[in-house]
């Protein structure tokens, strides 16, 4: 803490001090609220809505509204908001992030700003990380809102569209971040306005905001359909990847190195950058790939797919580790969440990486999916008019919240003083010595009946420690992605005396570890971290499992100089110093320099990861601007706007661009290439082909006018073919929707391909993001032209039908995130089954197989 903070307090302390008058004003209404009957308390909601309509603001109503909720919670749940919870509620209402330690009652805090903002009638979304929490909080906290006359809904993974629509129509809706994002994407794929489920995005409160907006920010939400691509190339590239030799680079190719003309000397066929998780082929490797596939130049556009797939295969073999990043179960690759350690059923890596891992592990390679719609959480949550968030750990990422989301973090004081002792890290030379020390620490705590929670980063480490503890005869539970069905049971027992629990990061959130009296006497829950995580935030979460609500406890991390964190990001000079000290085996190293090195290594990684996410946002911002234009266009069509003028503009634009492309102003009409013009325009607009006689003596602008006149007359003739004008208006909407969706889906794939290949621009001393923006702009314009041409072509060549129905361009086959991994119920038949020899239900007197059964078979 610097001198300024010591004298004036931290920024959070100053912010809390600033809002204390509001807190005191809220508390001053307590006696007034207590005197009201239930009916009078409920009537307050109507009163506040009326006052809002008369010009008062939410800030004017805040103290009284918060006091109303406080009294309602006391009557309905028997829980009264502490002063620190009122502070948290004000921070959330202001669109900021409240950092509240684990066990401080964040769930109850959300009721205050949710009620206040719901008074506007525009809807409030309370966002949780899984279905279980959404359902639990809606049933539990929802009682308070319902008591006060507001409606409460919950959106769960297995709900039908009409149930979702009803839930989003409520004043307050509890929903997971994944369902919220997917519903937004699905709403922008519907073909009738009545199929929309969401309202406008007004205000949201995000629980565990760091998990949603930072940990998951690098994984976009993707809705996919089946692709027609073969899976053979993945298997072929996997064979080649195993034949290529891993090499080293003399140093990293930075922009400055490229400008200075420094040469990077690379050995082997490919080099791996573990820090940035990137694989690159060397010159030697490129030649080997070209020879293997019998191609001349791997960099040619037609070889982009081979280039992409060989890099995927090398990533699968060198950066994706079994039992750490994924597990193989029932001939299937299941992803392990790196932050929680949980298996994520139904979720697949995008862009072909999942298929590359399937080929590596020799399980059935599933067909690659085609992206139909996609958005990142960064761009999705920035669509809200206002958003607030809660978490136990956010201060370390405050810069990111501020830069990307425009939100600041305020640390809320705890209700009771934290009693947990956080001890200095214990550092050892090797992993073997470190694990021996961990086992000794567990034995020592176990001897005095103190419960121990050992946190590991990988499944492999948890299983190694389990074997070591077994040899020592210490009974323990293991909690990792492989055994997560038992999670609730194991966590419930983790605070009991003598309990020893080994857990990957999954034991983190939404679960309470309660101590018994013997455990409390023995010093509370002892936390042992076996490795520092890349993020200080995840380490703080592990520590936060102990010492809830003033309970005793202690925490310590055990580290070795061989850990990935120290190996990749620790200072080499420092490592050499400690290596040369000649430390004896099993001796613990303690030095301020070492603690600083660990802290610096984590800061370096956090900065690195922030850079990756910021870079992703730079690219995705381009996609986002294009997505906004396309979705806005779609929404106009859905809203039933008359598209006649838009279609006429498309026709005239096509005539203008075709004429400009084929005819030059400074050439005589006799020199114009009429064949080129006729070949280009007549498949789209069926005009009479231009002849030399027709254009003789005319200027280009006059030709444009002649062609436009004929095109408009042709369209008017098409209009006259329809009995009702509205039939053609609906047809225009149907065709336009179909063309927009079809072209947009192809464009998403093209943009992804562009992003994959754009990194090479850095070698040419050009900024990849600038190049990406320029290429993306050109591609987007081409797509718009293509939409216009296809729409006009289809409308000119359509045959009149009495019934016009809209249909989706592509069938959705899945998403890349699944909140509910629970078993699905089998589909039940609504009517009795009709067998081939039964009498036909239509009443014809024939057997079913000779009547309607035959028709059904043909379909």
Task: Report each predicted region and the residues it spans.
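Positions in alpha-helical segments
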Residues: 27-31, 617, 778, 838
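Conserved P-loop NTPase motor core
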Residues: 1-582, 631-632, 648, 653
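Short, Lys/Glu-rich amphipathic helical modules
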Residues: 448-462, 639-640, 692-696, 841
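Hydrophobic, well-ordered secondary-structure elements that form the walls
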Residues: 454, 502, 744, 780, ...
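Short Cys/His-rich zinc-binding micro-motifs
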Residues: 830-849, 853
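Active-site-adjacent structural elements in folded domains
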Residues: 110, 438, 825-827, 835
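Extended, charged helical/alpha-beta scaffold domains that provide interaction surfaces
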Residues: 326-334, 340-347, 549-550, 557, ...
């Amino acid at each position: 803490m610097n001198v300024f903070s010591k004298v004036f307090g931290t920024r959070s302390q100053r912010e809390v001090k600033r809002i204390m008058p509001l807190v005191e004003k809220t508390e001053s209404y307590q006696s007034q609220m207590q005197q009201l009957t239930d009916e009078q308390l409920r009537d307050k909601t109507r009163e506040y809505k009326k006052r809002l309509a008369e010009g008062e603001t939410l800030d004017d109503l805040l103290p009284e509204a918060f006091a109303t909720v406080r009294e309602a919670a006391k009557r309905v749940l028997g829980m009264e908001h502490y002063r620190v919870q009122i502070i948290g509620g004000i921070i959330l209402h202001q669109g900021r992030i409240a950092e509240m330690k684990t066990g401080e009652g964040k769930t109850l805090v959300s009721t205050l700003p949710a009620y206040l903002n719901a008074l506007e009638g525009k809807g409030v979304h309370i966002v949780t990380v899984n279905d279980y929490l959404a359902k639990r909080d809606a049933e539990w906290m929802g009682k308070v809102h319902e008591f006060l006359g507001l409606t409460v809904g919950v959106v769960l993974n297995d709900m039908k569209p009409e149930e979702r629509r009803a839930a989003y129509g409520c004043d307050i809706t509890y929903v997971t971040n994944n369902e919220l994002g997917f519903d937004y994407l699905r709403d922008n794929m519907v073909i009738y306005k009545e199929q929309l489920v969401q309202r406008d995005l007004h205000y949201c409160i995000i629980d565990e905001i760091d998990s949603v907006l930072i940990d998951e920010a690098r994984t976009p939400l993707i809705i996919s359909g089946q692709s027609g691509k073969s899976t053979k190339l993945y298997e072929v590239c996997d064979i080649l990847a195993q034949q290529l030799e891993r090499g080293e680079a003399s140093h990293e190719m930075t922009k400055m190195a490229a400008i200075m003309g420094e040469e990077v000397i690379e050995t082997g066929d490919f080099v791996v950058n573990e820090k940035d998780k990137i694989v690159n082929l060397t010159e030697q490797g490129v030649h080997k790939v070209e020879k293997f596939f019998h191609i001349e130049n791997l960099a040619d556009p037609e070889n982009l797919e081979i280039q992409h797939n060989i890099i995927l295969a090398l990533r699968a073999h060198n950066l994706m580790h079994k039992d750490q990043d994924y597990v193989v179960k029932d001939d299937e690759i299941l992803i392990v969440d790196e932050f929680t350690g949980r298996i994520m059923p139904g979720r697949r890596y995008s862009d072909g990486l999942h298929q590359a891992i399937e080929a590596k592990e020799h399980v059935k390679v599933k067909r690659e999916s085609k992206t139909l719609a996609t958005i990142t959480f960064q761009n999705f949550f920035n669509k809200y008019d206002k958003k607030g968030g809660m978490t136990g750990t956010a201060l370390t990422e405050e810069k990111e919240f501020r830069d990307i989301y425009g939100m600041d973090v305020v640390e809320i004081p705890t209700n009771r003083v934290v009693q947990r002792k956080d001890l200095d890290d214990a550092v050892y030379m090797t992993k073997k010595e470190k694990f021996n020390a961990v086992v000794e620490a567990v034995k020592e705590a176990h001897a005095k009946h103190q419960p121990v929670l050992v946190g590991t980063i990988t499944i492999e480490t948890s299983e190694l420690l389990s074997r070591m503890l077994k040899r020592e005869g210490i009974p323990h539970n293991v909690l990792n992605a492989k055994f997560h069905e038992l999670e609730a049971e194991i966590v419930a027992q983790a605070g009991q005396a003598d309990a020893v629990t080994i857990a990957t990061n999954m034991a983190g959130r939404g679960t309470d570890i309660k101590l018994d009296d013997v455990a409390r006497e023995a010093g509370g829950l002892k936390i042992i971290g076996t490795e520092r995580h890349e993020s200080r935030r995840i380490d703080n979460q592990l520590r936060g499992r102990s010492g809830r609500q003033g309970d005793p406890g202690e925490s310590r991390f055990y580290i070795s100089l061989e850990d990935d964190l120290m190996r990749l990001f620790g200072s080499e000079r420092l490592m050499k110093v400690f290596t040369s000290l000649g430390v004896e085996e099993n001796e613990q190293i303690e030095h301020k320099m070492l603690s600083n090195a660990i802290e610096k290594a984590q800061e370096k990684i956090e900065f690195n990861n922030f850079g990756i996410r910021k870079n992703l946002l730079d690219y995705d911002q381009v996609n986002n601007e294009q997505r906004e234009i396309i979705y806005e266009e779609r929404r106009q069509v859905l809203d039933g706007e008359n598209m006649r003028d838009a279609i006429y503009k498309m026709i005239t634009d096509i005539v203008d661009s075709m004429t400009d492309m084929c005819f030059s102003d400074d050439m005589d009409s006799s020199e114009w290439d009429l064949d080129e013009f006729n070949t280009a325009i007549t498949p789209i607009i069926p005009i009479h082909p231009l002849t030399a006689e027709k254009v003789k003596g005319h200027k280009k602008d006059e030709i444009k006018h002649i062609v436009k006149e004929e095109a408009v007359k042709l369209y008017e003739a098409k209009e006259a073919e329809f009995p009702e004008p509205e039939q053609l208006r609906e047809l225009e909407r149907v065709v336009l929707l179909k063309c927009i969706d079809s072209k947009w889906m192809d464009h998403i794939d093209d943009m992804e391909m562009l992003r994959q290949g754009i990194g090479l621009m850095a070698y040419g001393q050009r900024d990849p993001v600038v190049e990406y923006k320029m290429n993306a702009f050109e591609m987007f314009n081409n797509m718009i032209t293509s939409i216009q041409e296809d729409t006009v072509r289809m409308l000119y060549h359509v045959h009149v039908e009495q019934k016009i129905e809209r249909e989706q361009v592509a069938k959705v086959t899945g998403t890349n995130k699944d909140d509910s991994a629970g078993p699905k119920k089998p589909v039940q038949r609504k009517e009795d089954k009709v067998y081939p020899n039964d009498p036909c239900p239509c009443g014809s007197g024939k057997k079913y197989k000779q009547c309607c059964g035959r028709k059904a078979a043909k379909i």
